[in-house]
């Protein structure tokens, strides 16, 4: 499983009080998306951050809305989406655009975006990673942990 070797971060040890985090989540593949969102919210609530959730139509829209949230004052964004490979090149186009766009948004804003975009060969891979009952991984929680941890690290580096 891809989660082998993942860092062991205790979300209850994260003190994100004072941080503002926006979760931007796509609506495609609702069962998986809902699991990702629940995992992210659980971590953000435990860390004590102020959380805003914005739902977007799909993964292609994640970068522009993530950047807008960062420009509007969010300290970090958690980007959640699900793209499942089909029989056309559409999968590659959307996956590449969303991934590159999120990277650019983060770098240009100088703020972290937790990457919770699942690019999958089939629905079962998403269920296995969505933090649902019986799932092997919780990528929504992992993305939220990464966003909060990195936001705190950047605040420390910048002396804020």
UniProtKB/Swiss-Prot annotation:
5-amino-6-(D-ribitylamino)uracil binds at residues 28, 59-61, 82-84, 115. Keywords: Riboflavin biosynthesis, Transferase. (2S)-2-hydroxy-3-oxobutyl phosphate binds at residues 87-88, 129. Pathway: Cofactor biosynthesis; riboflavin biosynthesis; riboflavin from 2-hydroxy-3-oxobutyl phosphate and 5-amino-6-(D-ribitylamino)uracil: step 1/2. One of its GO terms (cellular component) is riboflavin synthase complex. SUPFAM superfamilies: Lumazine synthase. Its EC number is 2.5.1.78. This is 6,7-dimethyl-8-ribityllumazine synthase.
